[in-house]
UniProtKB/Swiss-Prot annotation:
Protein name in the entry: Elongation factor Tu 2
Higher taxonomy: Bacteria, Pseudomonadati, Pseudomonadota, Alphaproteobacteria, Rhodospirillales
Pfam families, per the entry: GTP_EFTU, GTP_EFTU_D2, GTP_EFTU_D3
Encoding gene, per UniProt annotation: tuf2
GO cellular component, one term: cytosol
Entry-linked NCBIfam families: EF-Tu (TIGR00485), PRK00049.1 (NF000766), PRK12735.1 (NF009372), PRK12736.1 (NF009373), small_GTP (TIGR00231)
Amino acid sequence: MSKEKFARTKPHCNVGTIGHVDHGKTSLTAAITKVLAEAGGATFQAYDQIDKAPEERARGITISTAHVEYETEARHYAHVDCPGHADYVKNMITGAAQMDGAILVVSAADGPMPQTREHILLARQVGVPALVVFLNKCDMVDDEELLELVELEVRELLTSYDFPGDDIPIIKGSALAALEDSDQKLGHDAILELMKAVDDYIPQPERPKDKPFLMPIEDVFSISGRGTVVTGRVERGIVKVGEEIEIIGIRDTQKTTCTGVEMFRKLLDQGEAGDNIGALLRGTKRDDVERGQVLAKPGSITPHTKFKCEAYILTKEEGGRHTPFFSNYRPQFYFRTTDVTGTIELPEGTEMVMPGDNIGMTVQLIAPIAMDEGLRFAIREGGRTVGAGVVASIVQ
């Protein structure tokens, strides 16, 4: 079977199912493909096809993730579903599967459970912009008042983690009813209602190209008679020849002008998100720039040394540490293209961190790095990855 060409006629959006174990995330994923397949917007994938998620590696960490794609009238979606709780934690922290929005699945029979909380907190910390709730297994609850109580509880929980609990769409239904065609209203209709809510409520993500220009510097060359060239892959935005840009991180911020953009030995008028380019910098000396700095649109990003983050610490089996660590632990933090040493401060009441834990902590770096919330990094010891993290908020 030859792969169909991916028609980019509709806007694209990345979503995922999150929620407590056995609340029906994978069943819902299967149900969405089933219902949308009837309208020709998907290929039906049964529960066990999705449940056998292949392993992937992201930032040196093995994660099992299932990828499903489907489309509604409005958009094309890539949907991620993870088999185990640990996979969700790793996925959200490493950003292996980017989520522009998430569907929080809560069993109406159980209400919010510990992992429901944890996934909402993680979504908040890693910057998932919007959530939609599917109240699953409603066919198991006869009492309308009980359903309303569960809905209220979910809304209060969302509000307590700074999501707009009163405004978030909550759709009541049953993934199983949709898969077994046993109840039109709770099954088929609820899935369509859910997808309409996902279409309407999860904002269309800004394309990387439309964001302010940023390029991590990978290498620096001096070309006689022309000046200094820095190379790297443009992470976001566009840089045009003749534009003023800033060099940020490690040292004091410098201003310069991009006087040339080269790709595959050809001169271009501009470089854009995804391009591997060489940028010629006016009046910049070879020794003024280094790997680990970034080129960026002036004023769009600032250098910082202290931040709060959410991190996952690898287990011994994953190639991580064999022993716990304590406050004042000093590993390297690998941002984009370089390692910077930093000191970890654990939250009050946390004595130590064990391999396999995920933890919120504060980090103080010895040199400033261009950062904003949502920036991913690896935690390393002597070049070996021992953890992964994401910047939740900047302290200074």
